[in-house]
Amino acid sequence: MQLFVRAQELHTFEVTGQETVAQIKAHVASLEGIAPEDQVVLLAGAPLEDEATLGQCGVEALTTLEVAGRMLGGKVHGSLARAGKVRGQTPKVAKQEKKKKKTGRAKRRMQYNRRFVNVVPTFGKKKGPNANS
């Protein structure tokens, strides 16, 4: 039966169905130079085991096998590993309601009381409203 193998290029193999996936990998390695241990053979998106024969895997005539390179995995280094860390750790706190600011006559009354009525006479130079002392 005929079998299509899509690696870097599309290849056509003539097989009997008794070949193992490892034999297909070796054939692709000789054609394209990709080491067999770096290949992943996929049938309809599912990886195939090296020891399994094509008949056991459900490969029929005119089926396309895909050969993908093995991706190196592991930890992410650098700033990508910390992305979103602070926001994820910060607890959500409900916003507090603020008092409405006074306007007009009430605001002027509050300013008058602060400046002239509640004043405690002190000695020395007069300090401004933002002085830290």
From Swiss-Prot:
Alphabetized UniProt keyword annotations: Cytoplasm, Nucleus, Ribonucleoprotein, Ribosomal protein
Family as reported in the entry's similarity comment: In the N-terminal section; belongs to the ubiquitin family.
Keyword Nucleus carried by entry: yes
A GO molecular function held by the record: structural constituent of ribosome
CDD domains named in the record: Ubl_FUBI
Positions of region (Disordered): 84-110
Ubiquitin-like domain: residues covered: 1-74
Cellular component terms (Gene Ontology): cytoplasm; cytosol; cytosolic ribosome; cytosolic small ribosomal subunit; extracellular space; nucleoplasm; nucleus; small ribosomal subunit
Post-translational modifications: FUBI is cleaved from ribosomal protein S30 by the deubiquitinase USP36 before the assembly of ribosomal protein S30 into pre-40S ribosomal particles. FUBI removal from ribosomal protein S30 is a crucial event for the final maturation of pre-40S particles.
Note: FAU encodes a fusion protein consisting of the ubiquitin-like protein FUBI at the N terminus and ribosomal protein S30 at the C terminus.
Pfam families attached to this UniProt entry: Ribosomal_S30 (PF04758), ubiquitin (PF00240)
Organism whose genome encodes this protein: Homo sapiens (Human)
Superkingdom of source: Eukaryota
Compositional bias (Basic residues): 97-110
One GO term (biological process): translation
Positions of post-translational N6-succinyllysine modification: 125
Name of the protein: Ubiquitin-like FUBI-ribosomal protein eS30 fusion protein
The keyword Ribonucleoprotein appears for this protein: yes
